[in-house]
């Protein structure tokens, strides 16, 4: 005897949004410790064959990006679950590294994808403190402890040391992309994919950085039918955190955080 009720397919849907790094109590963003339990719960649903992950991030900490990427891949491998990733406005730098945890990656035609590189930025204030008559005093144990001090002239050996670290991080990033995308990468395009450049979703598809165009809702319905049940998993602020973050004592911290986030998002016109 056949049941007249068709069994519905359930797909857990995780959403990761914001700058990647140390989130803290009052900052919006993504880090491993704040997302680990959510990711674990999504992969723990019974009788699922796929997990969907939407990501909207311009990047941030390479370590936190790699921790999240590795955790998703380890759960997917252990539980034999397919991971479908959906880029929203932007999946760039560390955001794209996390996206590489997907067996398939989708994006909007206007999404910003890529930025496979490493950046370090700072300021030099050595002339300013001379003009205003400030004398800087620094005492260290270890000759390289004050590397890249913004209040003294840059040293050639410091820059060389920094660039060597950047090269190591860049190689790690490239290895993740090549492992994830494999033969999907368009190596005949004549475009170097690993210069830090970023592209629209449409161009990223032709370069093999993503698999297709579309949002989570339409792609999941296309794959699993109109009756697919999309169960959302997303970090929620606790009641007490909401109350605390609205207090005046945290206004300066939140304002500085907003300026920092705005600067990173603006790189991609957002």
Residue ranges and their predicted role:
Residues 1-108, 119-270:
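N-terminal organellar transit peptides
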């Amino acid at each position: 005897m056949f049941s007249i009720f068709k069994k519905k397919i359930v797909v857990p849907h995780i959403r990761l949004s914001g700058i990647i790094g140390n989130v803290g109590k009052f900052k919006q963003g993504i880090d491993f410790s704040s997302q680990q339990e959510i990711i674990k719960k999504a992969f723990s649903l019974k009788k699922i064959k796929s997990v969907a992950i939407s990501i909207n991030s311009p990047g941030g900490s390479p370590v936190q990006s790699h921790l999240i990427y590795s955790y998703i891949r380890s759960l997917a491998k252990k539980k034999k679950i397919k991971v479908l990733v959906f880029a929203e406005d932007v999946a760039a730098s560390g955001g794209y590294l996390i996206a590489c945890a997907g067996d398939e990656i989708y994006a909007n035609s206007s999404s910003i994808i890529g930025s496979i590189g490493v950046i370090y930025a700072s300021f030099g204030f050595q002339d300013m403190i001379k003009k205003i008559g400030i004398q800087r005093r620094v005492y260290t144990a270890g000759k390289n402890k004050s590397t890249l001090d913004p209040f003294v002239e840059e040293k050639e050996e410091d820059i060389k040391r920094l660039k060597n670290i950047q090269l190591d991080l860049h190689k790690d990033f490239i290895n993740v992309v090549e492992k994830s995308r494999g033969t999907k990468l368009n190596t005949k395009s004549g475009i170097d994919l690993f210069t830090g450049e970023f592209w629209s979703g449409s161009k990223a598809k032709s370069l093999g950085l993503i698999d297709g165009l579309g949002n989570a809702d339409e792609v999941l319905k296309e794959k699993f039918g109109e009756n697919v049940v999309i169960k959302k998993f997303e970090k929620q602020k606790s009641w007490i955190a909401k109350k605390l973050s609205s207090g005046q004592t945290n206004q300066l911290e939140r304002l500085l955080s907003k300026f920092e986030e705005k600067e990173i998002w603006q790189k991609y016109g957002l």
